[in-house]
Amino acid sequence: MILTAPRRPVPAAATRTASGSVKAPGARARVAAAGRIYVEGRHDAELVESVWGDDLRVEGVVVEYLGGVDDLGRIVDEFGPGPTRRLGVLVDHLVPGSKESRIAEAVRRGPGGEHTLVVGHPYVDIWQAVKPARVGLSEWPTVPRTIEWKHGTCAALGWPHRDQADIARAWQRIRDSVRDWTDLEPELIGRVEELIDFVTQPV
């Protein structure tokens, strides 16, 4: 009698992307399309890439990092949005009456405004767009205005926060806790999906 080791079942290939979209078999990244998405904040851009990166590559949509909303007017002018060249922008902490909302309104009324969509999330920081349970919290801590939010949050979590390197490691820990779109708050999910739909809609 010949004994053979039992065969382990081969895991099925993932059928969905991290954003929940159906993964097309053999889908490859497209050549960059004319439409583009700018994301304010480095951590914001990294989170968008980690969850929606597969979808964006298939659509050929390039995501650019926006250093600050004050640069938005210049970027719109340089990009030159049009019917076949749409521009989407995700802005940090976009709430009524804020500087961000005034700049977004000026862009909407300006040249190329009808082909530009500026949306935003309501969070003080993109960290809050990750469901707090992913880092063992029931809710994100309330940090006094006198304390920088990231430092105050790390302190509440008992994480090191002495310098920027500590903050970077804290963000990596939070970002790595995100498995897919279900670990994010709907206020961010809806805005990113809205931007992707806007810049990829057919002429």
PLM ranges: what are they?
Residues M1-V203:
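Acidic, divalent-metal-binding catalytic cores of TOPRIM
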